[in-house]
A protein has these predicted regions:
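Acidic (Asp/Glu)-rich catalytic clusters
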Residues: 42-49, 131-149, 178-181, 316-320
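His/Asp/Glu-enriched short active-site or ligand-binding loop at hydrolase and phosphoryl-transfer sites
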Residues: 208-220, 359-363
Length: 525
C-alpha cells in the first residue's frame, strides 16, 4: 500500500506584520497551495474517489483560514495580485535582454498569464472560501476523501513541554478539530514529528491510535507501522528513499529547469517570471517561464515517481516477506507555494496511481488493514536536522528554551491560583493561556536555528511572553480592571481559539513524567 501524507502548518501571523514576514506568508501559501490543492481534491471527490491521502492541518493554521480578519486580508491580497498582473501586462520598458525572463515581451506574457491565474483564484475564494476553510474541508472528511490528522494548539515542541500544558494543548487541539469539522481525529501529526518516551501514553489517553514520525525514528524500517511498546498506538514512519525523490534538502523534482523559479522576482510587480533554467544560471540570464515545458516535466515526474513507488513496494515486500507499506510525507506548502507546479503534479499522481495498479490508502486504512509490525521502543527524535532535538533545544536557542520553561511555569502558577470552582469563564486567564501557547510555538526556535527571519521569530516569542506576564502581573496585584483591559487589548490581535477555557487547564492532571527543560541541553549534545 502507498500512503501519501500532507502536513499543513503556519504559525499565527494575523496582526503580526505584513511583509516580508507576517500575513504575506499566509496569503501566499493560501493562494498558491491551499486553493489549488483543495480544488484538485474537490474534483477528485466529485468523481467518486475516496481514501486519497492523509491530510494534517494544525489548529493554528485552521484558525487563520477561518478568521474574519484573515479572510478579508486574503480577499484584498488576491485583488492586489490581479492589479499587479494587470500592471505587468501593460509594461513598456524593462531591463532584461531579449529572450530572458525580464524582457518586455516576457513580462507582458507573464502579466496576461498571472491575470488569468488571479482571476481564477478570486473566483475560487469568493465562491468556496468566503466563510473560511471549514466548509471546504469538512465535506472531504465526511465523505472519506481524506483522513484528517490533528495536532496540539499553537504547535509547541512537545518533548520539552510541561506535561500538564502538553496534555491540555493536545486535548484542546483535538477538540478544536471536532468543533470545526465535526470530526475528532484519531491520527496525529505531532509538531516537528517530535517524540520523547511517555508521549505515547498521552496519545492513548486522548484517543489517538496512530501518528507520524520520521523514518530514522524507526531506524529506517518504515515498511510497516510499529506500535509503541506497551500501547496500541502505532507510529508510521516517513520513507525517506521515496519522499526525498520529490523533495529533500539538496534535490528533488522542483529543481528541474522547466519549473518556475521560486527565488527570481520581477521587483516592480512582485511576480515570478522565470523558469529555473539551470542550477547555476544567474537570475538575469534565466529564461521565461513556459507552461507547456513545465507541464511536460510534470508528466515525466509523475511517471518517474510511480516507478519509484512500485520499485520500493516490491523491494520492501521482498525484504519483510509480506506486503509492505510506503509512506511519503511532505509539507502541503511545497505544493504550489515552493513548487508552482506541485498541485498539478499531485492531482495527476492521484489519478495515475490506481491506473498503475498501486493500492492507495490513508494511515487509518493502513492500521485497519494490518500494515503493522512488531512493537518498538521509540527514541527521542524529530524530523529536523540530525533527526534529534538540536533545532529546538540546541545552544543557538537556549534562551528560547529557558523562556518557554519560564512562560509555562508562570502561566501554570497563575492558573493554580484561580478559584477551584469558577462558575463562569475568566477572559483574563483565557487570554493569558492563549499568549503563553503562542510564545512557546516551535516555529520561533526553528526560524532562529535556521536563520530564517530570526529577528522576527525572537520578537514574536518575547512579545507573547511579555503579554502573558503583564496580564499575570496585573491579576496577581489584584488590579482586575487593568488585567481585563490588557487581556481585551491583546485579544484584539491574538483572539484565536475562542473556545479556549483556562478552567480546563486548572483541572488538567499531569499524566506523564515531566520532560524537564534541563534535558534540552543534554538532548542537543
Amino acid at each position: 500500500m502507498f500512503a501519501l501524507v500532507l502536513h499543513s502548518h503556519l504559525p499565527w501571523l494575523a496582526h503580526h506584520g505584513r511583509w516580508p514576514v507576517g500575513e504575506e506568508w499566509l496569503y501566499q501559501s493560501w493562494s498558491a497551495s491551499y486553493l489549488p490543492v483543495f480544488d484538485a481534491l474537490g474534483r477528485l471527490a466529485d468523481e467518486g474517489h475516496t481514501n486519497l491521502l492523509t491530510f494534517g492541518i494544525t489548529p493554528v493554521l485552521a484558525a487563520q483560514l477561518d478568521d474574519p480578519h484573515c479572510l478579508t486580508g486574503m480577499h484584498h491580497w488576491l485583488g492586489n495580485w490581479q492589479l499587479r498582473a494587470h500592471e505587468a501586462a501593460l509594461i513598456d520598458s524593462a531591463a532584461g535582454a531579449a529572450g530572458t525572463a525580464s524582457s518586455v515581451a516576457a513580462l507582458r506574457e507573464l502579466g496576461t498569464r498571472e491575470h488569468r491565474a488571479s482571476d481564477w483564484a478570486l473566483g475560487q475564494f469568493e465562491s468556496r472560501w468566503r466563510h473560511g476553510a471549514s466548509p471546504v474541508i469538512r465535506p472531504l472528511v465526511e465523505s472519506g476523501v481524506i483522513e484528517l490528522l490533528g495536532g496540539p494548539l499553537a504547535h509547541p515542541f512537545q518533548p520539552l513541554l510541561d506535561p500538564r500544558m502538553r496534555t491540555f494543548s493536545l486535548e484542546e487541539g483535538l477538540e478544536d478539530a471536532h468543533r470545526r469539522w465535526n470530526h475528532r481525529p484519531r491520527g496525529l501529526w505531532a509538531p516537528e514529528c517530535a517524540f520523547t518516551p511517555g508521549m505515547e501514553g498521552d496519545y492513548a489517553r486522548s484517543g489517538i491510535d496512530h501518528f507520524m514520525v520520521d523514518g530514522p525514528s524507526l531506524r529506517g524500517d518504515t515498511a510497516l507501522g510499529r506500535p509503541v511498546r506497551g500501547t496500541d498506538v502505532v507510529a508510521f514512519g516517513r520513507d525517506l528513499t521515496v519522499s526525498y525523490k520529490v523533495w529533500s534538502p539538496k534535490s528533488g523534482y522542483p529543481g528541474h529547469g522547466a519549473y518556475r523559479d521560486f527565488h527570481t522576482y520581477d521587483h516592480d510587480t512582485g511576480l515570478k517570471p522565470a523558469r529555473v533554467t539551470g542550477k547555476t544560471t544567474p537570475p538575469p540570464d534565466k529564461k521565461p517561464y513556459d507552461p507547456a515545458l513545465a507541464a511536460a516535466a510534470v508528466d515525466k515526474h509523475v511517471a518517474d515517481f510511480i516507478e519509484v513507488i512500485r520499485a520500493r513496494l516490491r523491494s520492501e515486500s521482498a525484504r519483510i516477506g509480506r506486503d509492505a507499506l510506503v509512506v511519503a510525507a511532505f509539507d502541503t506548502e511545497l505544493y504550489g507555494h515552493w513548487w508552482h507546479e506541485g498541485p498539478m503534479w499531485l492531482e495527476k499522481l492521484l489519478r495515475a496511481l490506481p491506473e498503475a495498479g498501486i493500492r492507495v490508502g490513508t494511515l487509518a486504512d493502513a492500521r485497519a488493514q494490518g500494515y503493522v509490525g512488531e512493537p518498538i521502543d521509540l527514541p527521542e527524535s524529530s524530523w529536523g536536522s540530525g533527526k534529534d532535538w538540536r533545532v529546538w533545544a540546541g545552544d543557538q536557542v537556549s534562551d528560547l528554551v529557558a523562556l518557554n520553561a519560564e512562560v509555562v511555569s508562570e502561566a501554570l502558577a497563575h492558573i493554580d491560583a484561580m478559584p477551584a470552582r469558577l462558575r463562569r469563564r475568566d477572559p483574563v486567564s483565557d487570554q493569558l493561556v492563549r499568549e503563553a501557547l503562542l510564545a512557546i510555538a516551535s516555529d520561533w526556535a526553528f526560524m532562529v536555528s535556521k536563520d530564517t527571519a530570526a529577528g522576527y521569530a525572537r520578537d514574536r516569542a518575547h512579545k507573547h511572553a511579555h503579554a502573558m506576564r503583564e496580564i499575570a502581573a496585573a491579576a496577581a496585584a489584584g488590579d482586575d480592571r487593568r488585567a481585563a483591559a490588557l487581556a481585551a487589548a491583546w485579544r484584539n490581535a491574538d483572539g484565536l481559539f475562542p473556545d479556549l477555557d483556562a478552567r480546563r487547564l486548572r483541572h488538567t492532571a499531569a499524566t506523564a513524567a515531566a520532560p524537564a527543560a534541563a534535558r534540552a541541553q543534554e538532548a542537543a549534545r
